[in-house]
Amino acid sequence: ISAYSLIVEEGTPLYEEYGEMCADLEKYGDYASMPKRLQTKYEGCKCLPDEETDRNMYHHTKTTLAKLIAGLETPTSGQISNYARPGYACRHNIGYWTGVEYLGLGLGASSLVGGKRFQVTADLNRYLVFTKEELAAGAQYEEIHELSRQERMEEFMFLGLRLTGGVRTAEFERRFGVAMEAVYGEVIERLLKEGLLEASVQTDSHIRLTEYGLDVSTYALAEFLQ
C-alpha cells in the first residue's frame, strides 16, 4: 500500500475546483490565518485539510497501517509512504531507492544500466515503424543520460534516504571511494541540528530521516542536490 498526501495537479478537474484554495493554503498555512474575506469565502464549503490536519492524517495513516501489517506500536515501513508485510515489499521500488540497475520495457519505459539512464519513446506510431536493426541499435531511446559521479552521489543520498533505514556511510565510501562526511558533512551537520536527520554510530553507521524529517522530506532531500 502506498499512502501519500494529496497533491492537486494543475489541469485536472480537481484543480479547477480547488486550485485557488490550494494556493491560499500554501500562502497562509491554515484557514484561521487567512484574511476575513477568504475565511468567509471558504466557510461552509468542502475544504481541503490545512497543513497541520494533513500531517495529523498522515501520521494516523502510518501508525494504523504499521499496526495492521506487523502488529507494531510504531510505524516501520522500510520505504517512506509504502507499507507491506515482511517479504512482500516492492522489489522494484527498493532497487530504485538503492541504485540497483533496472531495465524498462515498452512505450515510455525508463531504464538504468551501466550508469546510463535512458527512456523509450512514448510515441506508438514512431515505435511501430522501427526495424529490428534500428531497435537493436537503440533507435527507440529518446533520452540517454550518462550519470556523472556527482549525480550518482546525489542520488545515493536523496533516494536512499527514502528508506526508513536511511543510508550507510560504509556503502557510500565503497561506491565512491570517499567518505560521506567529506562530501556532505556540512549538509548532514545542519540537518542534524535542525532535527531532520538522526545518526547511528553503532556497528553499522548510517543516517536517516527523523519523524520530523519525514514530514518535510522534500526540503531535507533537496539539500543534497547541487
Language-model-derived ranges and their functions:
Residues L192-T203:
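A short, conserved structural fragment
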Residues T169-A170, A182-V183, S200:
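Extended hydrophobic-aromatic, low-complexity segments
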Residues G115-R117, E194, Y219-L221:
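A short, polar/proline- and glycine-enriched secondary-structure boundary/capping micro-motif
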Residues V178-K193:
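Short amphipathic alpha-helical interaction segments
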Residues Y212-Q226:
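Short, amphipathic alpha-helical interaction segments positioned at domain boundaries
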Residues D204-T210:
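Minor-groove-contacting beta-hairpin "wing" of winged helix-turn-helix DNA-binding domains
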Residues H60, F156, V183-E186, Y219:
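Long, highly charged amphipathic alpha-helices
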Residues I1-V178:
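C-terminal scaffold of the Radical SAM
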